[in-house]
Amino acid sequence: MHKILRKFFLRQKKRVKKQFNDKIFKKLTHLWTKKALKDGYIYNFTWEGVPIIKFPSDLIVFQEIIQKVKPDLIIETGVAHGGSLVFYASMQRIYNLKARTIGVEIDFREQNRQNCRKLFKKYNIEVINKSSTDPKVEKYLKNKIKKFKRVLVF
């Protein structure tokens, strides 16, 4: 790694530690997050045209996790509109991972399925329209997981 990049990551690590321990930073973050959730801020975003109910900063963290872990299977419980599934699968594609993405949603509505159909096919995404606590879903996923080396669950 180039020394300038090494310095960048060292400074980044120090900043994160400082911010983590900074009481004012924590308080402001808490207040902003509380207000943002109250005002529906997380409903303002899409990924490839699909609503994604996440803070944009969380997406960067998920991207970093996917880059480091390099999962060949990602499972998400609680899919809502499907945007995060598309996000995870597109990140796997960016990192050239021959991977699968599976979502489990108790109520994956038809309009969401129709909206996501092309992207789910493009990215090889599967949605299980059942409860994540259903024993049949658990059994299915346990069998599925056996075929993969690195599994990431959100």
Regions found by a protein language model. Give the residues of each.
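Short glycine/proline- and acidic residue-enriched helix-loop micro-motifs
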Residues: 45-47
